[in-house]
Amino acid sequence: MGKAIEELAHFAAATPWETIPSGVRAHAKLVLLDTLGVILAGSVQAEVAGVRARLTATGGRGATVYAPGWPATDPRTAALLNGLAGRSIELCEGHRYVSCQGAVQVLPTALASAEWLERSGRETLAALIFGYEVAARLGAGLTARPIAHQNGQAPLLGAVAAGARLRSMTGAQMSLALRIGATLVLTPGYTNAVAGATALNVAGGMSGFAGALAPELALAGVAAQPNAIEEAFGQLVGDGFRAEAVTEELGHRWEIARNYFRLRACCNPIYAALDALEEILAEVEHQ
């Protein structure tokens, strides 16, 4: 198995809370609150409510679905539903330098797993921080195919890391969970967005599902091939994988602190054009 993947897995599993800089912790709280607000707002979308009604009809317990009435279901389904809701309104945060909407795909696993396992708020926030770290760093290493969307790809493995962290898994166990997770990554395309296909948001929700599932598979004894991540990202869903990007400034540069918050329901490359349009319209109105 690759040295970089092992180093990242051990870092995410074993780094103490106390070593996280206070500024990073404070910023992570904002990311958590912003993402939770987006999940709640997205929960009332018609298709999200429809999926929720169908998937919670068979029962389940252990985790809250952040939606009107606060329904409960099993942690995997709750993570899926909360992730779907968060991706449905295009207000989830993103990473400035990597194609990675990490928080909305990592946090649902962290919330559902922490509730089920009765973990503390500090442990939940740490899971978000380290899950985001894994998502962004693997995303930096991944050479995406031209029309590939990041939903259900590197952020899915970030969710797996969050789930593993909350289960107090060792570095070796987290590595196994991540490599199992590599068999679950998805293949959504940006063409979904152009076509108005909201199935793209389901791929984001599935990150939460996989994040709650893969650690349990690892603990149950499921085996994974040593180079599963490198193969998946380098040859299958991706077009190359740079291992050196995974550990660049690891422990010194915290990826969650390099995010951006969305103030408009669109991806950040469009913001400058919308800002300019607003200024133009304001000038026209005053003429």
Language-model region placement:
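A conserved active-site cap/scaffold subdomain adjacent to cofactor or substrate pockets
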Residues: 249-287
